[in-house]
């Protein structure tokens, strides 16, 4: 049976608590671990009269298991794991070292005094649906015709995933050369490692950038991939690594090195890239563009509807990927802010971001520090993080799943406050 579980912790070493729970779940009789999400931070659910000391943020994740255990046996096992990891029975909203909730048990609907499945809160809680949408976006839970991703988008509360940008290039538009010192990140750059995703690119796609061959690109990204593998060694709950490349050779080598996502700004124009992805289990970012590198003189007609163009383009390219055997749940669509759009068109796409959700694919925006902001600020790209944060807040409010940004720590600090005050 395929089982979905939600994990949460807001006491002690929260990430370690969840990792120990996952390891214990994987060790249950007749059980194997299939997929698990990255970590999302959320505010504690509290009653109005809860003590102030209960107000501790949670870390959350989702897990997919295959198990031969019966539902009540699995419930008993999860409760034993909670107890072993220090969970103390107390009042409903009190902090806890670990929560392990059985969200779905195959396609069964279960209602007993001990267990209700699907879990009663699964359809209304962002901290449950956001991690689930990362690993099983197209899954339909019993009792609903909507996918997990569609359910997530129906609730007002949003919980975006953060993607940190790692440009291992000497000429990127806002941070070129920052990661080249000793092939390792500086202390300040380590903040980029605290998100859900890390996107590593070895070729600049800024206007006027010069193409690089795959060997040069690989020499740039390989040391960072190796560093990250060592940095996260032994950790289950680690960011997923994305390789930002349009080279099939680089993509194949990165997949072999263990990346989880291939982010191709060319929109998988090279058939060889599609064949490589079809033979892998990686997710992929499908980005709209008119030219790579970006060309400010090559933009959509000023009198067109940019969303209509995007909907048509994504529809065609998703069909190409599906014919190649790539399931839609693996695809993340990116409208390509800065690639073939004027500033006005980019802002319109941001404002109408929800229209991109008709494809039932996760949506990513790479909007950080880009030229569309020039009409609102005169600072250089490397200083546009406050402006980027404002755009990120609006995209998150519109339900966009993944936000690709440079100043990850600034965004996370902002988001913690924004969640509490918006």
What are these regions (language model features)?
Residues 1-44:
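N-terminal beta1-alpha1 ligand-phosphate binding loop
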Residues 162-164, 191-202:
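N-terminal glycine-rich anion-binding loops that anchor highly charged ligand groups
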Residues 239, 328-330:
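Short acidic capping loops at alpha-helix termini that bridge into adjacent secondary structure
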Residues 45, 49-59, 72-158:
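Flexible, gly/pro- and Lys/Arg-enriched active-site loops
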Residues 170-187, 205-230, 234, 240, ...:
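Active-site-adjacent loop and "lid" segments of alpha/beta metabolic enzymes
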């Amino acid at each position: 049976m395929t089982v979905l579980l939600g994990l949460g912790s807001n006491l002690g070493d929260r990430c370690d608590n969840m990792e120990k729970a996952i390891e214990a779940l994987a060790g249950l009789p007749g059980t194997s671990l299939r997929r698990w999400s990255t970590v999302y931070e959320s505010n504690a659910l509290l009653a109005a009269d809860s003590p102030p000391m209960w107000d501790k943020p949670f870390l959350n994740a989702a897990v997919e298991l295959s198990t031969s255990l019966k539902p009540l046996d699995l419930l008993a096992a999860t409760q034993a794991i909670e107890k072993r990891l220090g969970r103390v029975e107390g009042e409903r909203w009190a902090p806890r070292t670990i929560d392990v909730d059985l969200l779905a048990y195959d396609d069964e609907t279960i209602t007993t005094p001990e267990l209700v499945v699907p879990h009663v809160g699964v359809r209304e809680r962002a901290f449950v649906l956001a991690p689930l949408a990362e690993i099983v976006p197209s899954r339909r839970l019993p009792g609903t015709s909507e996918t997990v991703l569609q359910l997530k988008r129906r609730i007002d509360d949003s919980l975006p995933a953060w993607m940190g940008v790692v440009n291992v290039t000497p000429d990127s538009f806002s941070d070129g050369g920052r990661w080249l010192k000793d092939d390792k990140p500086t202390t300040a750059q380590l903040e980029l490692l605290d998100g859900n995703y890390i996107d590593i690119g070895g070729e600049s796609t800024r206007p006027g950038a010069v193409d690089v061959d795959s060997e040069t690109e690989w020499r740039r990204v390989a040391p960072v991939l190796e560093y990250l593998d060592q940095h996260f060694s032994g950790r289950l709950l680690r960011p997923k690594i994305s390789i930002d490349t349009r080279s099939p050779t680089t993509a194949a080598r990165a997949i072999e090195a263990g990346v989880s996502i291939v982010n191709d700004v060319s929109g998988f124009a090279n058939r060889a890239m599609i064949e490589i992805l079809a033979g892998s289990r990686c997710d992929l970012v499908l980005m709209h563009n008119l030219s790579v590198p970006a060309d400010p003189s090559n933009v959509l007609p000023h009198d067109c509807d940019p969303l209509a163009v995007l909907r048509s383009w994504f529809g065609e390219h998703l069909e190409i990927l599906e014919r190649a055997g790539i399931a839609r749940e693996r695809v993340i669509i990116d409208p390509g802010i800065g690639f073939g759009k004027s500033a006005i068109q980019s802002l319109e796409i941001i404002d109408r971001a929800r229209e991109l959700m008709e494809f039932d694919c996760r949506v990513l925006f790479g909007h950080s520090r880009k030229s569309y902001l020039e009409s609102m600020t005169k600072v250089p790209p490397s200083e546009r993080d406050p402006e980027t944060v404002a755009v990120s807040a609006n995209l998150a409010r519109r339900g966009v799943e993944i936000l690709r940004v440079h100043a990850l720590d600034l965004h996370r600090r902002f988001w913690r406050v924004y969640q509490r005050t918006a």
